[in-house]
Amino acid sequence: MHSSVPAEIRSGQHQGHTAGLAPGCLQVNLVVLPASHAQAFGEYCALNPRPCPLILLTTPGQTDWTELGTGLDVRRDVPAYNIYENGVLSRTVPDLLNDWSDDLVTFALGFSFTFEHALLRAGIPVRNIATNTTVPMYQTNRETRSAGPFAGPLVVSMRPIPAAKVAKAHDISAQFPWARGAPIHSGDPKVLGIEDLDQPDWGDTSETRDGGVPVFWACGVTPQAALEEAELSLCITHRPGHMLVTDLPEHDPFRAGNLQ
């Protein structure tokens, strides 16, 4: 399996979000931070596997990531990167060529885009793909488990699902523990401390019309919130919705011949 998406991103042919691209290929979130904080962040991922399912990490300074894809370069193959300084988003850039240093470690985390394709195959509509928008994301009233300087609230993504298909969506997504797994909650958003679904903290609004039930999954923005709390001098992530598309099969990236 080989995806042409990274090459298209690198050449500037594709600059938007990656929802619905390269069906069958695993999409991952990126977190890039100084090596001095890598162990603590790895522990944070282990303590919070739903929002931070760790797929793989690099050695310090490593830019080529052949384990994830042929010719893949972590500095250039994501449509947009967010750069944080002292916990504050300072800028968004199309590549990291001017911001890279040899002490940086990159983490790849699984993401819920992976199971969206499975939902579609099962006849369950995915609104953000149908409307070509970024899935809405919300900060909740639940806290993650801390490790070192890393702590913060759980962030969730929301997809409206027809009421008759909510249970099926739950069962399908539960088959992908490396990509958020089963939903955190379905139904009343106030249970999660979300007052207004029309005011997402990240992404685009998605109406819960036509009998749609709001279904919430743990989201890859959770570690971004933890990074902001940590106030590191420098850390880098993907821009929400703008993922790294790998060559790994999304249905089982850990099978023999892929990751061990």
UniProtKB/Swiss-Prot annotation:
Gene3D superfamilies, per database record: PSTPO5379-like, PSTPO5379-like domain
Annotated Pfam families: D-Glu_cyclase
Enzyme Commission code(s) on record: 4.2.1.-
GO biological process, one term: glutamate metabolic process
Highest rank taxon of the organism: Bacteria
InterPro entries: D-Glu_cyclase, Putative_hydro-lyase, UPF0317
GO molecular function, one term: D-glutamate cyclase activity
UniProt KW keywords: Lyase
Homology family: Belongs to the D-glutamate cyclase family.
NCBIfam families to which the protein is assigned, alphabetical: PRK05463.1 (NF003969)
HAMAP family in the record: Hydro_lyase
Protein name per Swiss-Prot or TrEMBL: Putative hydro-lyase Dshi_0610
Organism: Dinoroseobacter shibae (strain DSM 16493 / NCIMB 14021 / DFL 12)
